[in-house]
Amino acid sequence: MTQYTLKQASVLLQSKQISAVELASAYLAAIAEKNPALNGYITIDQDKTLAEARAADERIAQGNASALTGIPVAYKDIFCQTGWRSACASKMLDNFISPYTATVVQKLLDEGMVTLGRTNMDEFAMGSTNENSFYGAAKNPWNPEHVPGGSSGGSAAVVAARLAPAALGSDTGGSIRQPASHCGITGIKPTYGTVSRFGMVAYASSFDQAGPMAQTAEDCAILLNAMAGFDPKDSTSLEREKEDYTRDLNQPLKGLKIGLPKEYFGEGNSADVLTALQNTIDLLKAQGAELIEVSLPQTKLSIPAYYVLASAEASTNLSRYDGVRYGHRAAQFSDLEEMYGKTRAEGFGSEVKRRIMIGTYVLSHGYYDAYYLKAQKLRRLVADDFQTAFARCDLILAPTAPSAAPKIGADASPVETYLSDIYTIAVNLAGLPALTLPAGFSSGGLPIGVQLIGNYFSEAKILGAAHQIQLNSDWHGKRPE
């Protein structure tokens, strides 16, 4: 029962061939069996889950259900939900029970979706491997010696391991797409401002965006229909007419112009990644898509620009964790200043401290112009590159990551780890939508994904193209043993 896609489970629930309680119980049993080794979930509450499932069954019986009623979903530990621990995988919030619910979570609860639990992540969403979690690293379900990616590593792992049909992630510099690629599932980062950030713990406010993760592009489109929309509680939320993100699912690939950025196909990619890209290019050609070489010359500037800007925003956002109102507080201190210092030293992990220090430095007097303002200018150049490319093509095909998932504990420096986000970060700098979908496997049997990047508000076009690719391939149907 846990092998169904979201769409398949929806059909079975609506036709009353299975009940929401049966489906939730099957997932809870699978979680109890497999999660101790996987560590994809860090908070489970069977009683709450089954209560939501019973309520969903009542809605279905009364005939007022939506397509998502009764479907279980996992939430990255960055989303607040009343009565659930929302720790952001940090010691700082280990004892924080949220008094309110994130807008995007509330939207899915209103649809009748059933909460399975909170998934593991890099602390405060800072990381690319899930090794920065206070609760220990989640494992890659394809090979437990390897990372699932990050920061939404737990969400990617539980969907790939069939411990949830869908999950929510957040994407600040690639945190939905990179782990989805490493775990062999589909995930989309929408246009910045499409999905409300209210109740999603802030890392870098001008980058953060929530999105769905599932087995297929069709599942992601169904979820995005429920998630998107204006929210007056989020000042960055965009007021736009409601869209149907499933509208292009049946649009053929014939005539679609796909840009291939020459800077993304270079020596930095493993042979396995280049093979996966070539497989996708061959499929697109066979389906009648037109392939055009484009250039994104400022890509090389995206990593330094991103880590200056995101760290600056993080140092500001994380200043609220001071031990006064909520969260961890040091046990022993002699005055207020010592309490602040000890609380933050004990509560934050090393990567979070590193980014706070970088951010505080680049915002400090004498360095603001040299680093922060310069990075803002580079951000504009990166965004302009994409607009030049989209004048010639509808979508851009790119690698999601330069290689398959590395081993847990691989001796990479922070800079080497940051460089693994080279293909995802530019999209966040520009605020564009992008989706990753499975496109092959490495010689070691680990999944490899490719990215489809679109212009602003082209989610339906991206999801349609991805769905057509998935109709003509089976990478998304493969699952770990």
From Swiss-Prot:
GO cellular component: glutamyl-tRNA(Gln) amidotransferase complex
Record's keyword terms, sorted: ATP-binding, Ligase, Nucleotide-binding, Protein biosynthesis
UniProt-listed Enzyme Commission number(s): 6.3.5.7
Active site: 76 (charge relay system), 151 (charge relay system), 175 (acyl-ester intermediate)
Protein biosynthesis among keywords: yes
EC top class, as a word: ligase
Top-level taxonomic group: Bacteria
GO term, biological process aspect, one: translation
Catalytic activity: L-glutamyl-tRNA(Gln) + L-glutamine + ATP + H2O = L-glutaminyl-tRNA(Gln) + L-glutamate + ADP + phosphate + H(+)
GO MF, any single term: ATP binding
Gene3D superfamilies: Amidase signature (AS) domain
Pfam family, one: Amidase
InterPro entries the record matches: Amidase, Amidase_CS, Amidase_dom, AS_sf, GatA
UniProt cross-references to HAMAP family, sorted A to Z: GatA (MF_00120)
Family, as annotated: Belongs to the amidase family. GatA subfamily.
Quaternary structure and partners: Heterotrimer of A, B and C subunits.
Function of the molecule: Allows the formation of correctly charged Gln-tRNA(Gln) through the transamidation of misacylated Glu-tRNA(Gln) in organisms which lack glutaminyl-tRNA synthetase. The reaction takes place in the presence of glutamine and ATP through an activated gamma-phospho-Glu-tRNA(Gln).
Protein name: Glutamyl-tRNA(Gln) amidotransferase subunit A
